[in-house]
């Protein structure tokens, strides 16, 4: 959430940011109207309370002098009635202002390029060369079904479209990747945590998923939301709290749940876009002056997984029209998918500055008083999409899949997934 004082003093900066995000400026216009009315009511309320104090003293004086107080008491009743009306109006304006503030996105950083959509995202670097196949590569879903390690039919049978059952070496590969990613990030200095995946509304609001993305979330009947990403529970570990020692680096594996699988006809086959998927997350809490250096380091930490797996990828700097609601700056890591002949997102690494911390009230102490921390996070990585990249980039002509060398210790030394080695 932005600082209301900043919005009030620099409305044109916020309007410009909304325009660059391809958004209407109606929100800021409505906010400023309510803010003016709210402050006017605050002034009137203060004046009425001052007047009430004056009348109270006048009544006391009249009583002391045994004089008639009826007119002053009637005046006091009128003042009290108006104060109650004003207080109700103030509460209503304050609620409306808060609701609008929750819907205003973060202001992109000066190093976030201006653009309309993903086509305007500049490439920062390309790492690795896409493999040149001597045969026509198969998509991951065909490989998975042929090797009997991915069962889309059973997933649809027990849950519906957008769910998959991993079997045998498929399940082991998924688990191996989770363990591998967590161990790499632990060596990088992140503390592993294992948080709940049922999240309350306050926590979902703190990281910016609510209210804007409510329709993309799974809401349980008792009011809990299923975590769309580990970013939510991990960031909110410090909700309404002070962090006594910065920086704090955390990593977590969770299952994630989103309603968007196969939306608009995209990725309706395979496991690139699922309602339930696994992800390893990186989260940082840092001082404001270090947050952009820490974004570069966090991005490098996520990249290390791709480098160790020897998967070709690129890094793009998201433009203002593509960046997430809460982010000030984001790098996407995109892994090469041979059968699509393009790079696909496998991680987003973002600096939120104090946007999330202000919503979740996460602070640290300074000699000048409390300040909001800066929060950052990134996928390290999306596990299912890493499986996609391995199956497609490491496939062989005979239908088997080579296991990346770095994963073999996590799979009992197995070197391949084939119809002979499936369990």
From Swiss-Prot:
GO terms for biological process: selenocysteine biosynthetic process; seryl-tRNA aminoacylation. It is an enzyme of class 6 (ligase). GO terms for cellular component: cytoplasm. It comes from the Archaea. Its main location: cytoplasm. SUPFAM superfamilies: Class II aaRS and biotin synthetases, tRNA-binding arm. It is found in: Cytoplasm. This is Serine--tRNA ligase. It comes from Methanosarcina barkeri (strain Fusaro / DSM 804). The gene is serS1.
């Amino acid at each position: 959430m932005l600082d209301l004082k900043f919005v009030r003093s620099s409305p044109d900066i916020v309007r410009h940011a909304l325009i660059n995000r391809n958004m209407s400026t109606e929100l800021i216009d409505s906010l400023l109207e309510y803010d003016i009315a709210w402050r006017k009511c605050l002034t009137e309320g203060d004046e009425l309370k001052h007047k009430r104090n004056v009348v109270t003293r006048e009544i006391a004086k009249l009583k002391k002098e045994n004089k008639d107080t009826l007119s002053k008491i009637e005046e006091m009743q009128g003042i009290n009635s108006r104060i109650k009306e004003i207080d109700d109006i103030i509460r209503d304006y304050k609620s409306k202002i808060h609701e609008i503030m929750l819907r205003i996105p973060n202001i992109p950083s000066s190093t976030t390029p201006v653009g309309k959509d993903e086509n305007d995202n500049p490439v920062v670097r390309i790492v690795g060369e896409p493999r040149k196949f001597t045969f026509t590569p198969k998509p991951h879903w065909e490989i998975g079904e042929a090797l009997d390690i991915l069962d889309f039919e059973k997933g649809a049978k027990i849950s519906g479209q957008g769910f998959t059952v991993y079997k045998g070496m498929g399940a082991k590969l998924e688990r191996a990747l989770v363990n591998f990613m967590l161990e790499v990030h632990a060596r990088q200095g992140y503390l592993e945590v294992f948080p709940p995946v049922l999240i309350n509304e306050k926590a979902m609001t703190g990281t910016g998923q609510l209210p804007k993305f409510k329709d993309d979330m799974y809401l349980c009947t008792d009011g809990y939301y299923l975590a769309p990403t580990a970013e939510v529970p991990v960031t909110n570990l410090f909700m309404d709290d002070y962090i006594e020692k910065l920086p704090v680096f955390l990593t977590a594996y969770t299952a994630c749940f989103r309603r968007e699988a196969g939306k608009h006809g995209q990725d309706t086959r395979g496991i690139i876009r699922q309602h339930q998927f696994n992800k390893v997350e990186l989260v940082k809490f840092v001082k404001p002056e270090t947050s952009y250096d820490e974004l570069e380091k966090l991005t490098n930490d996520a990249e290390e997984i791709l480098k160790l797996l020897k998967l070709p990828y690129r890094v793009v700097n998201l433009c203002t029209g593509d960046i997430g609601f809460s982010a000030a700056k984001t790098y996407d890591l995109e892994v090469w998918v041979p059968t699509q002949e393009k790079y696909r997102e496998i991680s987003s690494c973002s600096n939120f500055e104090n946007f999330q911390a202000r919503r979740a009230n996460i602070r640290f102490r300074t000699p000048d008083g409390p300040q909001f921390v800066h929060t950052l996070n990134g996928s390290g990585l999306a596990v299912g999409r890493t499986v996609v990249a391995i199956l497609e980039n490491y496939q062989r002509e005979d239908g088997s899949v080579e296991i990346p060398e770095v994963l073999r210790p996590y799979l009992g030394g197995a070197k391949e997934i084939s119809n002979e080695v499936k369990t």
